[in-house]
């Protein structure tokens, strides 16, 4: 018995407060006490109560709360509740960070992370089971398109659980920026509707100056071979390039190309030959836009790494050879300038298609969605891995539903301007699923497989490895607090169910691609959880943040190509202009690139979340060390970038978002 001091924290978003009454109960190991005091939670405020409890409750296990309403259910966003018992006892935190709706009773467990094995008396077992049962009703698996990895069920935003929706500041920013982009598009369309574009400089009419210094650099230098090669190392899509171990079988040399073959073999022997192969686009159905057939290629680019770190193209093949036909032409830097430029435009357009669909949408957004749904279905809020990973899952479901209803939907942006639209994008996503290997989501393995370890001019590779290592140590710190032995890992049924749900259900049998169906050791847990967090943070940032820089100048990343790939080398400026997107397609590409690629004013940098899901000093110390290491990496990148002609920013912790939220 004695006096209890209770603090209740309400979120700061616009509608977080409530005019409904909230009643509280304290649940301890030896009893339960209803608190007669009721409160009206105010937005952004902490409310403090002092309540005399007549009986001894023992160690506190839960705070229960119920919001009552007579006429209107006014939802309340509760951050947390803390309780300090009689005397000078420690303050006990009960994290919530969710909306409280309706009249039901919500139980919040004390914030210490606990596995099933950490609860031998079963004090939390009923709560775990009931919470997961309710979550499995809210978070159901859906299948947007047959043959793809699974997604959350629900075709519209209103189908999502309320806790997955944008808070007001995020929603307003997203919708206002979209309206601004579309309004600008309408203005540019009206100004250019009767204009015939004849020169590459005409793309300046839809280029947004002042948005990105690097974008302006791309506009001025996009024709240069050095910038073309640089993008494979450090551009918007740095995950295609690999070091050659042999000359690709598809690279058929027509008569008279013996010198080229010898040059390639020399670079191969020296370990300086690299390739970017877009064979995945072969056979993909090209879009038809307003009755006009669009076109796709499946290029191969062979590049050489020079001693100064520059990556320069040696040859471009735009199509795969076909039986019974002459070998496709090989385009060279020594070809007529327009022929070589057009070949590079085809490569850039192909890279754009694969980047947005495979690297960004599939491997970033949709993979993160699998992690979100599996986590919500399999890990209760008291589980330490849930507490560790939940900050990195914020807003992912809403941004993905918006993508499925606006970008890749029927008559969406892809259908309007992308050469892979009109069904080709779905076909490509299905085929790309075969390349979702476990190792490809883990930079130490992926970079080794692609031969990029030790390439000094690959800043993506260097920064990805450093960020992965920092996240791994963070995960390792939390895992070591809760799993003292490998047996504890094997004996955690919730952890094993979560792993299996991701691999077998969400990823549709990905054990054939190296994903685990069970976790047998602490090292395996650390590796798997690090993969999840890195996918939702660093890897998504590396393929998202470069869009405004590299795609604003449309000729550097054409969303579609209006003429077939060339089979001769007699291209003219007229050929190039007739092939590149028209003004409406280019304007819409610019508008969407700005909206999605701009630096987000409402964002949380990796590791900087305000939510505190763990109680106790040990997890807080692990998080503090994580933040210190992130700050040190950020400073190192800043110092390095100051010496570079083109700074590489996309994996700076201060601009890497904490989740897939845009």
UniProtKB/Swiss-Prot annotation:
PROSITE patterns: LIPOXYGENASE_1, LIPOXYGENASE_2, LIPOXYGENASE_3, PLAT. One of its GO terms (molecular function) is iron ion binding. GO terms for cellular component: cytoplasmic side of plasma membrane; cytosol; lipid droplet; membrane; plasma membrane. It comes from the Eukaryota. Pathway: Lipid metabolism; hydroperoxy eicosatetraenoic acid biosynthesis. It is an enzyme of class 1 (oxidoreductase). Fe cation binds at residues 360, 365, 540, 544, 662. It catalyses: (5Z,8Z,11Z,14Z)-eicosatetraenoate + O2 = (12S)-hydroperoxy-(5Z,8Z,10E,14Z)-eicosatetraenoate; (9Z,12Z)-octadecadienoate + O2 = (13S)-hydroperoxy-(9Z,11E)-octadecadienoate; (5Z,8Z,11Z,14Z)-eicosatetraenoate + O2 = (15S)-hydroperoxy-(5Z,8Z,11Z,13E)-eicosatetraenoate; (5Z,8Z,11Z,14Z)-eicosatetraenoate + 2 O2 = (14R,15S)-dihydroperoxy-(5Z,8Z,10E,12E)-eicosatetraenoate. InterPro entries: LipOase (IPR000907), LipOase_C (IPR013819), LipOase_C_sf (IPR036226), LipOase_CS (IPR020834), LipOase_Fe_BS (IPR020833), LipOase_mml (IPR001885), PLAT/LH2_dom (IPR001024), PLAT/LH2_dom_sf (IPR036392). It is a peripheral membrane protein. Its cofactor is Fe cation. Residues 2-114 form the PLAT domain. Pfam families: Lipoxygenase (PF00305), PLAT (PF01477). It is found in: Cytoplasm, Cytosol; Cell membrane; Lipid droplet. GO terms for biological process: apoptotic cell clearance; arachidonate metabolic process; bone mineralization; cellular response to calcium ion; cellular response to interleukin-13; fatty acid oxidation; hepoxilin biosynthetic process; linoleic acid metabolic process. SMART domains: LH2. Keywords: Calcium, Cell membrane, Cytoplasm, Dioxygenase, Fatty acid metabolism, Iron, Lipid droplet, Lipid metabolism, Lipid-binding, Membrane, Metal-binding, Oxidoreductase. Residues 115-662 form the Lipoxygenase domain. The keyword Magnesium does not apply. Its main location: cytoplasm. Binds 1 Fe cation per subunit. Interacts with PEBP1; in response to IL13/interleukin-13, prevents the interaction of PEBP1 with RAF1 to activate the ERK signaling cascade. Belongs to the lipoxygenase family. Non-heme iron-containing dioxygenase that catalyzes the stereo-specific peroxidation of free and esterified polyunsaturated fatty acids generating a spectrum of bioactive lipid mediators. It inserts peroxyl groups at C12 or C15 of arachidonate ((5Z,8Z,11Z,14Z)-eicosatetraenoate) producing both 12-hydroperoxyeicosatetraenoate/12-HPETE and 15-hydroperoxyeicosatetraenoate/15-HPETE. It may then act on 12-HPETE to produce hepoxilins, which may show pro-inflammatory properties. Can also peroxidize linoleate ((9Z,12Z)-octadecadienoate) to 13-hydroperoxyoctadecadienoate. The PLAT domain can bind calcium ions; this promotes association with membranes. This is Polyunsaturated fatty acid lipoxygenase ALOX15. It comes from Pongo abelii (Sumatran orangutan).
